[in-house]
Amino acid sequence: MMQDLRLILIIVGAIAIIALLVHGFWTSRKERSSMFRDRPLKRMKSKRDDDSYDDDVEEEEGVGEVRVHRVNHAPGNAQEHDAPRQSPQHQYQPPYASAQPRQPAQQPPEAPAQPQQRPQYGQPSQPQPAQQPAQPVQQPVQQQPVAPQVQSAPQQPVQPAPQQPAPQPAPQTFQPAEPVAEPAPAPEPVVEEAPVAEKPQRKEAVIIMNVAAHHGSELSGEVLLNSIQQAGFKFGDMNIFHRHLSPDGSGPALFSLANMVNPGTFDPEMTGDFSTPGVTIFMQVPSYGDELQNFKLMLQSAQHIADEVGGVVLDDQRRMMTPQKLREYQDRIREVKESNA
């Protein structure tokens, strides 16, 4: 997708550059042609200004009267002199009609016909033929407006000024390349969904029973230690006794025995010089092997110790153990096994 976008941008940029080059060549060529056209017009304008200036000077100096006398003596010659002056006007105007709109401002000085009428005071009959050639001079001037072909002048508005928009291609700096930041889709791998597959927590339970002395008495430490060892417990971790899978203390621990008095530990030196109100036997479910069989073994060990020390077996609330409480323990064990199955 990015390659297609880049290719399209490159093609569009190339087309824009070519268009700008063609437009530049076309405008420069047009400017040159307009410059060559304007030069002859400027020359014609300067010549006409000079002619009009000479005519004005002659009129002010009274040269007009001399022309009137010449017309009286040789009217044919006067016409010949006037005709060639008119002919260049016809020659210059048609090819460069674009300059004709400026002539109306210069035409008033070309009306020498009026000063020629001044000699009428002395010879009223003779100036008339002199006015006749002056009229054709005005007629072509009136016909000159036919040259409104000057409409070609609107071509001049095609000036280099329109080239100023050329800097507009600057926006074509391919700023769209900025979307290169599209690597943003990387967040798609939302691995957080993995926690959705949370495994159900493993249900656990602790079965507790106690062996305690009768009310108001305590168990002798020496007798208690002997009975614990006979039940297959071995002293071990956390300074308490553990019943392992094998009576010799090998294999995983099935259940444990702790002192009922805080902190619940026994003396590591295993001396019998102590007494205690009782001991606590507990089993964590699930455990190694068959939990129901382990519970039966735990119950047998508690009864054996109680018989040896002259105590009684109590439940987790330190009440007399009853058949209903035993069934409750067994139901709890089965519930844990089924929930973890």
Swiss-Prot record:
GO cellular component labels: cell division site; plasma membrane
Record topological domains on the Periplasmic side: 1-6
Keywords annotated in UniProt: Cell cycle, Cell division, Cell inner membrane, Cell membrane, Membrane, Transmembrane, Transmembrane helix
Compartments reported by the entry: Cell inner membrane
HAMAP family to which the protein is assigned, alphabetical: ZipA
Membrane topology: Single-pass type I membrane protein
Quaternary structure (record): Interacts with FtsZ via their C-terminal domains.
Biased composition (Acidic residues): 51-63
Topology, Cytoplasmic side: 28-341
Keyword Transport attached: no
Entry superkingdom: Bacteria
Residue ranges of the region described as Disordered: 42-199
GO terms under biological process: division septum assembly; FtsZ-dependent cytokinesis
Compositionally biased spans, kind Pro residues: 157-170
Positions with biased composition (Low complexity): 85-105, 113-156, 171-181
Family (UniProt): Belongs to the ZipA family.
The protein's name: Cell division protein ZipA
Ranges that cross the membrane: 7-27
Function description: Essential cell division protein that stabilizes the FtsZ protofilaments by cross-linking them and that serves as a cytoplasmic membrane anchor for the Z ring. Also required for the recruitment to the septal ring of downstream cell division proteins.
